UniProtKB/Swiss-Prot annotation:
The gene is MT-CYB. Heme b b566 binds at residues 97, 196. Gene3D superfamilies: Cytochrome Bc1 Complex, Chain C. Belongs to the cytochrome b family. It comes from Necromys amoenus. Keywords: Electron transport, Heme, Iron, Membrane, Metal-binding, Mitochondrion, Mitochondrion inner membrane, Respiratory chain, Transmembrane, Transmembrane helix, Transport, Ubiquinone. Pfam families: Cytochrom_B_C, Cytochrome_B. Heme 1 (or BL or b562) is low-potential and absorbs at about 562 nm, and heme 2 (or BH or b566) is high-potential and absorbs at about 566 nm. The keyword Mitochondrion applies. PANTHER family: CYTOCHROME B. The cytochrome bc1 complex contains 11 subunits: 3 respiratory subunits (MT-CYB, CYC1 and UQCRFS1), 2 core proteins (UQCRC1 and UQCRC2) and 6 low-molecular weight proteins (UQCRH/QCR6, UQCRB/QCR7, UQCRQ/QCR8, UQCR10/QCR9, UQCR11/QCR10 and a cleavage product of UQCRFS1). This cytochrome bc1 complex then forms a dimer. The chain crosses the membrane at residues 33-53, 77-98, 113-133, 178-198, 226-246, 288-308, 320-340, 347-367. This is Cytochrome b. InterPro entries: Cyt_b/b6_C, Cyt_b/b6_C_sf, Cyt_b/b6_N, Cytb/b6-like_sf, Cytochrome_b, Cytochrome_b_C_euk/bac, Cytochrome_b_N_euk/bac, Di-haem_cyt_TM. The keyword Repressor does not apply.
């Protein structure tokens, strides 16, 4: 008798991707975050769909429609807070996923890595346009400040900003198109995720030892399905605790005030997951320079496969690069903290130092430590 999952044209694809997929036997819990990101994406699409049924993308009613969802819709408050805090969980998983990729040298699978960078940019774009939708003070001013950065582009900047706004300021046209973008982008992300998985399954997964694991593979199901299930349960528990006990802890108090173009908040800042990039943007006095640094802060991830000269895969047996890696993580946390602080001394100075350190570590220190460790091996 033929096994249906191995012969059916559609089930065969699922079987090769999630059931009979040969997987290294030693991958640790740090490899769980890929599946957790998939779950986060599904949660966001489902909760977002139900929110879109009640939300109105009009400047006069957007704020009150969000209030209506929380007060009058059955479990609307839960759907709204799961969606808002689900975004935070998404980015926590995303940062850990990228961090693991850097630590264990997953960037050598360059196609998968580069699609991952595109996914990172797309997710950031989705989160940004989504943050604007509740039409609170920070939503409005965040949209105004960040879109205005495009005016730094020589010659076409001002025209480009007015084109994105749909007028001469952030208004009804802007909100409507941002809602349209926010609705379509998660499906574009889903398409890129499939390409990401396609490239990954072409080469096979990396593993903590950094050695070739072809001689030691096990089927994905049941070993890693059970392991992923545990991760998913922990993620859902963390998300539920966040959404039910501390729903507004990661939000901004200014967003409880409806958008007012005549009143600027004291400190304009984006959501916490953008603060590191925002700190890099603010640390450069020149507008165009700041925008380029902002883009480079993520795009520099593409440099990892190019700058890697190490004879060893991953950092597990490389103490010098390990130290530099953890310095990089600490520096990233400092940037995140500084991004949320007001623009005054000593934060401006510390932000500029942390921004320079961020790029120096990736471009200079990591390749240098690779060379040093290669020479130590030769001794």
């Amino acid at each position: 008798m033929k096994i249906i999952r191995k012969n059916h044209p559609l089930l065969k694809i699922i079987n090769h991707s999630f059931i009979d997929l040969p997987t290294p036997s030693n991958i640790s819990s740090w490899w769980n975050f890929g599946s957790l990101l998939g779950i986060c994406l599904m949660i966001q699409i489902l909760t977002g769909l139900f929110l879109a049924m009640h939300y109105t993308s009009d400047t006069t009613t957007a704020f009150s429609s969000v209030a209506h969802i929380c007060r009058d819709v059955n479990y609307g408050w839960l759907i709204r807070y799961l969606h808002a805090n689900g975004a935070s969980m998404f980015f926590i998983c995303l940062f850990i996923h990228v961090g693991r990729g850097i630590y264990y040298g997953s960037y050598v699978l360059s196609e998968t890595w580069n699609i991952g960078i595109i996914l990172f940019f797309t997710t950031m774009a989705t989160a940004f346009v989504g943050y604007v939708l509740p039409w609170g003070q920070m939503s409005f001013w965040g949209a105004t400040v960040i879109t205005n950065l495009l005016s730094a582009i020589p010659y076409i900047g001002t025209t480009l900003v007015e084109w994105i706004w749909g007028g001469f300021s952030v208004d009804k046209a802007t909100l409507t198109r941002f809602f349209a973008f926010h609705f379509i982008l998660p499906f574009i992300i889903t398409a890129f995720v499939l390409v990401h998985l396609l490239f990954l399954h072409e080469t096979g997964s990396n593993n903590p030892s950094g050695l070739n694991s072809d001689s030691d593979k096990i089927p994905f199901h049941p070993y890693y399905t059970i392991k992923d299930l545990l991760g998913i349960l922990l993620l859902l528990m963390a998300l539920m605790i966040l959404a039910l006990f501390f729903p507004d802890v990661l939000g901004d108090p200014d967003n409880f005030t409806p958008a007012n173009p005549l009143n600027t908040p004291a400190h304009i800042k984006p959501x916490w997951y953008f603060l590191f990039a925002y700190a890099i943007l603010r640390s450069i006095p020149n507008k165009l320079g700041g925008v380029l640094a902002l883009i480079l802060s993520i795009l520099i991830l593409a440099a990892f496969p190019l700058l890697n000269t190490s004879k060893q895969h991953g950092l597990i047996y490389r103490p010098i690069t390990q130290t530099i890696y953890w310095t990089f993580i600490a520096n990233l946390l400092i940037l995140t903290w500084i991004g949320g602080q007001p623009v005054k001394y000593p934060f401006t100075m510390x932000g500029x130092i942390a921004s320079i350190t961020y790029f120096i570590i990736i471009i200079i220190l990591m390749p240098m430590s690779n060379t040093i460790e290669n020479n130590i091996i030769k001794l």
